[in-house]
């Protein structure tokens, strides 16, 4: 949903122009998450002394694209872009409207007052903001926006106005604020009262910190500092400890005595360091590959160029520190290259992405599968009584697509659940269930809530994600990283096929010791081996599919029909068309045709049917004849070796043959391409469809 980016340079001189360029570039890297407005907050004034400028915060906010914000920044007449800052914190945000319409006043950063004493950027939803707003209004604080976030900015100002001591730290104020908040949030704060300091925190929404320095860092594992006495508003003292040691002085900066020197992260030899706060790694990878992923209720503070991480209270299972991790992502992976859009690039990356999903895991010489993330739990999974796959959107369709092969190879009942419905029903979950959570981002709010629901009931939890360090990958007992590479386009393509392959690999791993399954396992593994080449063959049909799109783009609706392994393909193809073309589209189980959908069929209704040479072939042929009998003119996606269907149908898209349980990967790609070309012909932004976000981090 919303995108957070902040940049702090400490003793690394940067001009205001360079700082703003970094902030704008960070927002551009987060555009794929979906947004309707954007804003930046930075030090104003044109003094040569950075500390004087830090006492004046300037906000620039704009409805629309980041490009419009960039243009607005350069329109400022009274702003010297060449002023140099030795220390500076700038924060930036792309907003997805949840409370209040898209407008500059509702955009972030939100401010505490007209003097911009405190500003904050926020991703998430505060559920008790009305109560907080009512309280703050009773104390004389005036509100100018309709957002829930403004209550946070006003609340930190209230905490500051009512602090018990001049030495109360920025971190302490933020801790007091988040104790009052209910809901989900990732927050970064900036204040004129604490120049050069940044405080970030999260609960339920992702936040990471990138670190860049030319010098050796003091540690690669930051200990968590716990408050040894619960902080209360109006309390006289604040004490901190890490494993029994005090780690903070009264001003909130790190006490670097011999005992406490490892409680902060800082450059050992020099003070020069840069920090980047962001919603995800795509915004920081061009600056640094060293990052710290924050956990729920972490409060990260940068004071005097030193980073420390705090928590209000210790709970069972808390990890004692946060590791500095090295990202493997490369900048060119998130660039478009020679393609017109990220979605097009990601569709054409699928031959490589499925190889990356299988690399090091599938041995085609001895027909073995090794999923390292599941190795320690595979015996427990094999003893379970039921598999439950929980997901949303495209990830849900990946579960539906592989349900049949999972049931066949594991001989277990398999449920595939939409996360929101799963939670609404309070679905019974037992200790001998194994629950899978599928999410490209690893941050999908409903799926994450489902994970916590299942953990409370004692089930073994397995994550299937594309994002290292995501909430789902951290909170599950074990999992599989699909290794599809960064997916920027809002409409998921390569993540779907990689999730599909990952679940098939899991099914193969589950039955590796069953003699009765060996021939079937070998057949599927040979299919996996040939899959990348077959995907390339399907992609070579792009011109043919573009021609079909020119015939359909003026239509208002399209029906997609299939059954068996291809019901999920119908659902996924219809979703892609809905998402980026804004055409009504419906995925229909061909077995349900006579139970209502057949009434929609006439000579004007576009119909796409998927008919493959598998166990449902005869029934799909019956459905085809019913559509033709109602003057329907279906386009049939079929096996290129199916001469009967090709001969009896006027329009076909012929895909190569694969093993039945993998054929859905080859049949979905023409629908991905069709959706892409329809959107282009209709004049829409393929990567950023209206009203949609890449990562849905609120319920």
UniProtKB/Swiss-Prot annotation:
| Residues where substrate binds | 394-395, 439-441, 444, 595
Entry's Gene Ontology cellular component terms = cytosol; extracellular exosome
Q: EC top class, in one word?
A: transferase
Q: Glutamine amidotransferase type-2 domain spans which residues?
A: 2-305
Provide the alphabetized UniProt keywords.
Aminotransferase, Biological rhythms, Congenital myasthenic syndrome, Disease variant, Glutamine amidotransferase, Phosphoprotein, Repeat, Transferase
Pathway of action: Nucleotide-sugar biosynthesis; UDP-N-acetyl-alpha-D-glucosamine biosynthesis; alpha-D-glucosamine 6-phosphate from D-fructose 6-phosphate: step 1/1
- Name the Gene Ontology molecular function terms of this record: carbohydrate derivative binding; glutamine-fructose-6-phosphate transaminase (isomerizing) activity
Where, by residue number, is the active site?
A: 2 (for gatase activity)
Report the SS bond pairs. Answer: none
* Top-level division of the source organism's lineage: Eukaryota
The record's NCBIfam families line, in alphabetical order, gives: glmS (TIGR01135), PRK00331.1 (NF001484)
Protein's UniProt name: Glutamine--fructose-6-phosphate aminotransferase [isomerizing] 1
